[in-house]
Amino acid sequence: MVATCLQVVGFVTSFVGWIGVIVTTSTNDWVVTCGYTIPTCRKLDELGSKGLWADCVMATGLYHCKPLVDILILPGYVQACRALMIAASVLGLPAILLLLTVLPCIRMGHEPGVAKYRRAQLAGVLLILLALCAIVATIWFPVCAHRETTIVSFGYSLYAGWIGAVLCLVGGCVILCCAGDAQAFGENRFYYSSGSSSPTHAKSAHV
């Protein structure tokens, strides 16, 4: 029963974390920047936000973004962080699909428990790789951006990335280390067989 609960916890945690990584990848509020001194920006009420795909200006009644489409003039760290976040988002899809197939409520024919166990281990590895890509990108980007401009604060995109990466890392570790062995994956299923006393007699394996 404990292994079953940990499998579900690992799946839910990883799924929520993956959504956070996707939000971070697709939004541009990574860091809040200031083109002047911080007191001047606050007095003018003019701040900027910088992300992977656009630089934005936020002022009273104005929000304008300039897409970063010219790859040749983009800083190397922006391109590298783009690649890392895209890789993290893509890795999450097969990891979540694999975790779906190993949940206790899902049964694919009469497959042995070792097959589910191997899929769970692969999903756990993918989730840890996802988390590492997101962690590197969300730390590297603000450090390098600080060298180019004054950073006032971190944006919600960066916080979503940190939370998502940690959740994926926790979910992957739970799946790899705590969700049981091949025997546990084989026992966490329910099946039905006909009994002599009634036409439909439910029988369940020990969990």
Curated annotation (Swiss-Prot):
Main location class: other
Positions where Phosphoserine occurs in the chain: S193, S194, S197, S198
One CC-aspect GO term: bicellular tight junction
Transmembrane feature ranges: 2-22, 83-103, 123-143, 158-178
InterPro entries for this protein: Claudin, Claudin11, Claudin_CS, PMP22/EMP/MP20/Claudin
Cytoplasmic side: 1, 104-122, 179-207
Gene Ontology terms: biological process: axon ensheathment; cell adhesion; spermatogenesis; tight junction assembly
The protein, known as: Claudin-11
Species this protein is from: Macaca fascicularis (Crab-eating macaque)
Gene name of this polypeptide: CLDN11
